[in-house]
Amino acid sequence: MRAAIVAEAKTWIGTPYKAVGRIKGVGISCAMLVYLVVRAVRAIPEGATEPKWYSGQVHLNSTEDRMIDCLVAYGGREIAEAEVRPGDIVFYKTGLSFGHIAIIVDWLGTVIHAIPKNGCSYAHGTREGLLSGKLRRYFTLIGDE
C-alpha cells in the first residue's frame, strides 16, 4: 500500500496548482492531491466523501485543523517522526493551523505536495525552501505491515 501511495502521487508531478483543484494535468491543491491519491489506491474507506476542508486561506485566520480532522475521520492516526515511512502524510503549520499537507516519498524527507509557485512537485520536507523550519505533524493511513 505504501508503494502504491507514492507511485500514484508521482503521477501528479507537473500538474499546476489550483486552489481546490482536482484534475490531473490541469490543476490540484495540496489537500485534494492527498485525498485523490489515497482514494485512488483505496487507502481510505470505500464511499468516503470528498473533504470540504478549507477556503484555501483558512489556515491564516483559523486555529481549526480541518484537514487533520478529516484525515482522522478516514482512519488516519498520528505517529511520531521516528515512525514515518514512505506513503505517510505530513502536515505543516502555516499560519494559525496545520494548513499544508504532503505525502512522504522516502526516508530522506522528500515529499510530494502542491503549491502555487511549483504546482505538484517534489520538495525536501524539512531542510529547504517553503517547508523548512515549519512545525510538523505526521499521520499514517496504513495499519501494521
Model-derived features with residue positions:
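Short leucine-rich amphipathic alpha-helical surface patches
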Residues: 91-94, 115
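Short, solvent-exposed coil/turn linker segments
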Residues: 78-80, 123-126
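A broad, low-specificity signal marking well-ordered, structured residues that form hydrophobic/aromatic
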Residues: 15, 109, 136
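N-terminal capping segments
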Residues: 1-75, 81, 86, 93-95, ...
